[in-house]
Amino acid sequence: HASAHASVRLREDDRRAVHGKRNYTYSDVVRSVLGGRKFQLCGLAQYINLVGVTIGYTITASISMVAVKRSNCFHKHGHHVKCYTSNNPFMILFACIQIVLSQIPNFHKLWWLSIVAAVMSFAYSSIGLGLSVAKVAGGGEPVRTTLTGVQVGVDVTGSEKVWRTFQAIGDIAFAYAYSNVLIEIQDTLKSSPPENKVMKRASLIGILTTTLFYVLCGCLGYAAFGNDAPGNFLTGFGFYEPFWLIDFANICIAVHLVGAYQVFCQPIFGFVENWGKERWPNSQFVNGEHALNFPLCGTFPVNFFRVVWRTTYVIITALIAMMFPFFNDFLGLIGSLSFWPLTVYFPIEMYIKQSKMQRFSFTWTWLKILSWACLIVSIISAAGSIQGLAQDLKKYQPFKAQQ
C-alpha cells in the first residue's frame, strides 16, 4: 500500500516544472520541489540503492545459472550427489554480457526489453506456482506446517526467528522499491495519451499483479514445503523434477536479470558521464564520439570514456558480488536502506509541499504516520539483514562461494 500510494504522489509531482524546467529523473524532481540538502541526500540514497541492486542482480543471475548446471547434475547422478558448483564463473559470464550491453547507446529506446522482462517474469513465477500446486496435490511425504511458521526450539532459536523475520521484511521492501526509476521510465513514454496517466495505470496493474504472485508463492510454497521451505524454490532445489522445466525457469530468471541490470545501471552511467562532460568539456577522451564499422551491424558510435567507465563499473560490481554472494541477506539490506527514503519519504514530502497542505490536517497527519511507520520497518529489516550478513561472514571465504 505504501509503495502504491507513494508512486501516485511521485507521478503527480514529476511533471510540475519549476522555473519552466521539465523534470526527467527522480533526483530532478526532488531538487525542483525540495531543493538543497534533501536533494543531496536523495542522490546519495538513490545511487547507493542502484549500485546495490546491480550487485544483487549479479548474485541472483549467477545463482540461477548455477542451478541449471546442478539440476542437470542431479538428474544424471541422483539427488544424493552433492554437485557443488562455484558461482564465480557464472558471475564472470554475466559480467561479460553486461560489458557488451552497457556499450549500446540509447539503451532506453529498446522498447522490446520491457516485453521480454515481463514474459520472463511471468514464466518463472508461473512455473514456481505450478510446481508448488503439483507438489501439494500429489501428496507424498507430510510436511511440517504451523500457524506461526518455523518452530522455536525445533527449527530455530527464538532470536534466530526474530532476526529472520526482520530480514524477510527487508526482502519484501526490496521487491517494492521501484520508485527511484519510475520517473526515468515515465520519461520514455509518448506524450499522448498523457504519460502520467499511463504510468499510473501501469503502476497499479504492476503492483496488484506482483502482490498476487508474491502472496501465492508464499502461501503455496509453505503449503508444499512447510517449515523446510528453501529461500528460493527454483534455485534452492525444493523441486528436482521435471528438471527441464526447472532449467527453463532458471534461464528465464537469468534472461530477465540481464535486462533488469541495464535498466538500473543506466542512471548511474548517465550521472557519471554528464559529470565528466561538465568537468572536462574540451577533452576528446571524455566527449569525442568515434564511428566504428561492425560487420552486419553498420556504424556504431564509440566514446572511449564511456567504454572505460562502464566496463570498470561492471567489473567492480561483479567483484563485490563474488566477495559477498549472500542472496537473501544482501537483497534485504538493499531493500531496507532504500525503501523508506526513496519509496516513502521523498514522494510524501514533495506531495505535502506541492499541495501546500496544512500542518496537522487529517491528510498531513495520516501521511506522516505512514512515513514514520515505514521508517520503523526499514530500521528493523536493516538490523535483521546486517545480523544475517554477519553470521554468513563468520563461515565464508571470499571468492570461494559454492552451491
Please annotate each region the language model reported:
Residues 1-14:
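N-terminal signal-anchor/initial transmembrane insertion module
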Residues 12-46, 56-90, 117, 124-339, ...:
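Membrane-interfacial loop- and helix-cap regions that link adjacent transmembrane helices
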Residues 96-99, 315-320, 375-382:
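Hydrophobic core of alpha-helical transmembrane segments in multi-pass integral membrane proteins
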Residues 100-107:
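C-terminal ends of transmembrane helices
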